[in-house]
Amino acid sequence: MRRLCALALILAIAIPTSAFAHGVVGDYVFLEPLIAEDPTPANEWDVVQPSWNKTSAGNNFALGSSLEKVLYLDENYMARVSVGIGTEWHYQWVKNAPDQRGFDDLEMFAKWAFYVSAKHEFLLSAAALLEVPTGNPSVEEQSHTSLGPLFLWEKGMGDLPNWTAIKYLRPFGFQGDFSYLPALGGHTSHLMSADQVVEYSLPYLSNSVQDIGLKPPFRNLYVFTEFNYSQIITGPSGQTFPSVVATPGIAYVSYHFELSFGTQLALNRASVPDTHAVVIGLLDIFYDSIFTKAGNWTINKGFPE
């Protein structure tokens, strides 16, 4: 893992920073969140998403990975439809009990960006999310298949006036989602969740507002905070309290990849037992910038010329 992170940092400095390949709506480039779902259909591979958290019951280490593929482009070559798949591997050190390890549920989704305004850096999308209990029952979140809707949005603030006192607000961006994921059988969880991401883009500041002299890698940094809510609204007694946490972090976004790190802070009493200490990371590859023909294939446009 140390070697992987070191290699990513070396590449971050070496790769040109004049263009981006992910999450582009108008002039704003939205990052890939750590916890929240990404509203933008994209060709991307979350190669590894490591996380460690110390809880009241012990410790949990997870390695997540997911893959997303754009299937449809509109007449302006904006990605409109994508599908994806992902899972996590867990190792849990449980107090006064044997260690548990194995894969979590298999997650699959189909995403549709049904409204895009490049002028206002605004996008709305919807997705269908399916979770199948294909992993180890001792570490899985759910023992029954779940299927439900996901509503997503993102908005850049670039349409604010370029006045002296206001222009520095233009690099702000907002991403969010709301989902309801009921189990299709059994008496276990019906999960409701919502996320809101507030991000500040130093690339946007330098390229679209005012160049303040930042050099790589600082020129390509984002600072962000996610606000994450989740709650089992139908489930076992004593397990239906809402969990609300803040996930602050920093991200480096280049033409080929994103490298992010963050932590989590409890915002209500119910989330304290699961957030004694948390570290989260993400290495996300925008593979259509590397495999420019195969990675950019879509159903309606085929391979790029």
Predicted regions and their residues:
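Transmembrane beta-barrel domains of Gram-negative outer membranes and organellar outer membranes
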Residues: 21-185, 189-305
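Bacterial N-terminal signal peptides
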Residues: 6-16
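Positively charged n-region of N-terminal signal peptides that target proteins for export
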Residues: 1-4
